[in-house]
């Protein structure tokens, strides 16, 4: 059974999303997320003011790009951390967004992440699951965000902003 090592709370302009992070199963990914959220890697909290730039109702919400375009990141990449205990069998999984593998086989994870709203097992092995939505109130916030109006490129018509992120070790 997976035990969470941290709780991250994303304070958005649509409400708070509490996330359980699985640092034992995905230690590099969780450390990266925590360090970005706290500002340890960048000198200031990386996710504050960043938007969910891609929202697809019935699939997922994606954020973590400081440019808001889907092309930005922290300036470095790291490899996937697939784990047999972390799958997409159920909705509300937190995972790293990436651009697939580089020619040399290395990963393209950086700062972008997504939260699923349905089971998405076809993503396993392509994206590192490193957490899940922690409670029903947070799930309702995720569901509400997933249903905001978007343009044909899945960008919200009105910004869905991550105002701040709190991290708590457990």
Name each model feature, range by range.
Residues 1-170:
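Cyclophilin-like peptidyl-prolyl cis-trans isomerases
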């Amino acid at each position: 059974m997976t035990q969470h090592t941290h709780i991250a709370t994303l304070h958005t302009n649509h409400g708070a999303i509490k996330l359980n992070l699985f640092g034992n199963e995905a230690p590099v990914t969780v450390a990266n997320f925590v360090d970005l959220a706290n500002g340890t890697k960048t000198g200031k909290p990386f996710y504050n003011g960043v938007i969910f730039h891609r929202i697809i109702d019935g699939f997922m919400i994606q954020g973590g790009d400081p440019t808001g375009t889907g092309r930005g990141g922290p300036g470095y990449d790291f490899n996937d951390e697939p784990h047999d205990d972390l799958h997409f069998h159920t909705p509300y999984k937190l995972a790293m967004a990436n651009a697939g593998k580089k020619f040399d086989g290395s990963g393209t994870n950086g700062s972008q992440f997504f939260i699923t709203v349905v089971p998405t097992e076809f993503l396993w092995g392509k994206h590192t699951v490193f957490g899940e939505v922690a409670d029903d109130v947070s799930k309702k916030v995720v569901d509400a965000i997933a249903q905001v109006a978007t343009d044909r490129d899945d960008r919200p018509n009105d910004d869905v902003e991550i105002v701040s992120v709190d991290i708590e070790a457990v």
